[in-house]
Amino acid sequence: MRTQWPSPAKLNLFLYITGQRADGYHTLQTLFQFLDYGDTINIELRDDGDIRLLTPVEGVEHEDNLIVRAARLLMKTAADSGRLPTGSGANISIDKRLPMGGGLGGGSSNAATVLVALNHLWQCGLSMDELAEMGLTLGADVPVFVRGHAAFAEGVGEILTPVDPPEKWYLVAHPGVSIPTPVIFKDPELPRNTPKRSIETLLKCEFSNDCEVIARKRFREVDAVLSWLLEYAPSRLTGTGACVFAEFDTESEARQVLEQAPEWLNGFVAKGVNLSPLHRAML
């Protein structure tokens, strides 16, 4: 039997770079919120202990894909602790809607959905803390998708505090370019000393993203989309880009702006949600 699992997008409602560690990683403060929009992971169990990704990504080797890595990591961790039923395996496919290099967390969300879904389907019984710890070894954004609640993040993104920001409507636009995260973080002009503030203070301030100035400078497509959106609503970059978003109080307002968008602007309307669609599906 094939089961389907949501793999939602996220937005960084704000993102501030507060420093850089000796190992090169940047410390930050950011606010994660999920969208009721994303990819769908399809899983069909098999009994021969094998993992097969049926929808490979061009240019990514099977064993290097985050989906496969997540499945194998869960398999090894559960087996090492005697919690993996004999023969546990899976065929996995993905209905992809989220762009790569878009700042919407697609790859991290896919990995988290696989961890949560296979832990349930294989009946391994690992806790959310264990799954989040495993997820962190796959990527800094994976734990927030595993835990499934909007969160204020610090450190390199792994220190999470659940929060409940307003669930607004968003017009999310993709400029048609992919931005590798290192391109932004290695830019010498990236702000790296934004003062650390409490979540209470940050929630009262106007939200912004320290990476936005670099993305707009280096990618004219990002600058063009943001310039257009800012004529209609508060708008900013998510993550390190390339996607940008405008926020609205109602769905109709967001859709009215999307209907006026020029032909070169590709976007969708989605609602911000504080409980991940993945976790809603498991209730």
Curated annotation (Swiss-Prot):
Active-site positions on this chain: 10, 141
Reactions this protein catalyses: 4-CDP-2-C-methyl-D-erythritol + ATP = 4-CDP-2-C-methyl-D-erythritol 2-phosphate + ADP + H(+)
MF GO annotations: 4-(cytidine 5'-diphospho)-2-C-methyl-D-erythritol kinase activity; ATP binding
Source organism superkingdom: Bacteria
Keyword Membrane found: no
Role of this protein: Catalyzes the phosphorylation of the position 2 hydroxy group of 4-diphosphocytidyl-2C-methyl-D-erythritol.
Assembly and binders: Homodimer.
Name of this chain's protein: 4-diphosphocytidyl-2-C-methyl-D-erythritol kinase
Gene giving rise to this polypeptide: ispE
